UniProtKB/Swiss-Prot annotation:
GO terms for molecular function: rRNA binding; structural constituent of ribosome. GO terms for cellular component: cytosolic large ribosomal subunit. Residues 140-166, 211-239 are annotated as: Disordered. Methylated by PrmB. PROSITE patterns: RIBOSOMAL_L3. One of the primary rRNA binding proteins, it binds directly near the 3'-end of the 23S rRNA, where it nucleates assembly of the 50S subunit. It holds the Pfam family Ribosomal_L3. This is Large ribosomal subunit protein uL3.
Amino acid sequence: MRSGVIAQKVGMTRVFTETGEHIPVTVLKLGNCQVVGHRTTEKNGYVALQLGSGSRKTVYMPKAERGQFAVAKVEPKRKVAEFRVSEDSLIPVGAEILADHFVVGQFVDVTGTTVGKGFAGGMKRWNFGGLRATHGVSISHRSIGSTGGRQDPGKTWKNKKMPGHMGVDRVTTLNLRVVQTDVERGLILVEGAVPGSKGGWISVRDAVKKPLPKEAPKPGKFKVAGEQAAEAPAVQEGA
């Protein structure tokens, strides 16, 4: 099981195949995604990689966090996340994971925080049908109707779909296809929509419900500080 990466959502665009078909894609950018720590079975009870991405001013950072990045010899990161991996998929601390960690054509699972919509009614939040437009209905056309129950059970059950805050939920979208990668600019283009707003942090990992391509690098594609990574084409077409 390989590590995922931390990326930022840039926005959506489209790419064209050789046959003229256009594919809507979401552009994800790797902002110097580095390994900042290991989690081992002996010390932590599980095996994982701790990754960091982006940059952060140390003046606003707790002393304990500054020490953690100092030990790893990496610059302070704005976003930190853990990815469970197998023993043979550990990547050295300080290594930077590159965009061609994923290969064109493979499927990935992406996780992000959805756009906040504020307080929403039942029709917008849960796709309720609402009440009738006429025939005695006044003012309550968009209400949810009955919340269920009479004297027995005499209450509204927990988790009943009702109006309330909508959005800002942690959502995972499965099986998005990698269309292109740009190693020089650190870009990954995936087919379809990705949850979250522009600039939001996205976790990208190998799809759990699809087989991993044989050409996918193991334990991953990365470069260690002071070393040159293997040369790769700037853009790989996935027609």
